[in-house]
Amino acid sequence: MSQPLRRGVRAVSWTRVLPPRARQGQTRCLQIRAAAAEQPSSANGNNLPVVGTPSSAESADARFDVIGAPYSLLSVSLSASQNLFTRRGTLVGLSGKADNVVSTLSVLEPFRRAVVGVPFLYQKVSSASPVTALVSVRSPTTSFAVVHLDGSVDWMVAQRRALLAWTGRSLSIKPTINTSLSVSHWGSSEVTGRGLLALVGAGQLYQVEVKAGEQYIVHPSNVVAYTMTNNPPRPYRFKSTTLKFQVPGLKGWPSFIQDSKFIRDMSGSDTWKTAMNIFHKIRTWSRMTIWGDRLFLQFDGPATILIQTRGPRINEVLTSHEVNEIASAPRGLTIGPAKPAEEKKPSADEEYRKAAEEAVNAAPAPTRTVEQLEQEIRGSAQSIATLTKEGKVIFEKPGQQN
């Protein structure tokens, strides 16, 4: 028997004869490592990567770094004379020459932002020398994501309080107002130009890359931001149970009941209006709680989506009117696909020429072409102007005798 094998046998036999108390003093070190997670697949069968958001972004004048575990701080490195806009009350600390730093309170479009519930009070920080600032939020269950805009792709910030900080001389942020049934644009901010953008979300933030030809459906309360493409996200509604919940109305009753004086007086009373208001509130509440999981957004690739793991309640994202509109629609897309550009309608001259060609070709033996027919019609409609000695102008048609 070889020497290493003998040592192994002796070691095993020695441990067997040890008393239980002696065995308790022995320890063994274990290493536990997280296995690499596999990429999930999309419903279309193709690979749909769900990865973490970039932890840093850099431009010519600034740099954003997300630090902390979990991500809880944003480090901003600014060059001289570069402006940093951050939400009021989020600036934690600043390193550099404090005498060169200027901090002012900026009010950004308060009337437009207040209508959609977007914060409009921001702190503007600038310095004559390079500085480094730390930015954070009060909530302990948030994480940060940074986005570098190079001017080729615009972004839409879907959540009202997701915009934390930004920098860039040509960066423009405009709030969008919901003028119609547009689920994805309620309380959103359109970001265009070039610069750096810092977003904050509840829980962890992840980035979803949707390739061309793929579709991805996500709950609107979990969407933080997404790239703006020719195919905007559309509301989607899953199939639900056949349970119907309707508010009783008078239109379904027979006409002789609707025309009765008692029914007319009752429908115009305050008691009836209060009862109908209560029924409508109950219906809206049931759609937000019982059928609320049916309201989703469908994204068509190519697109990039930032999603958060902890979304707010549905009533913080959608209004009661939007919930009722979507819940009343059949399952599937509540808004049709993007319509292609409308075909150019033929002008009146083209229609006239086409009709003339059909009329000429319909004859058994056409003796005139369309051009000759047009010239004949144009000639019969001509008038000749004659200037008399008295200075008068007389219009005469061809062939007309005085």
From Swiss-Prot:
Assigned keywords, A-Z: Mitochondrion, Transit peptide
UniProt KW Mitochondrion keyword: yes
GO cellular component terms given for this protein: mitochondrial inner membrane
Ranges of Polar residues composition bias in the record: 39-54
UniProt subcellular location: Mitochondrion
One of the GO biological process terms: inner mitochondrial membrane organization
Protein's UniProt name: Altered inheritance of mitochondria protein 24, mitochondrial
Classification of source organism: Eukaryota, Fungi, Dikarya, Ascomycota, Pezizomycotina
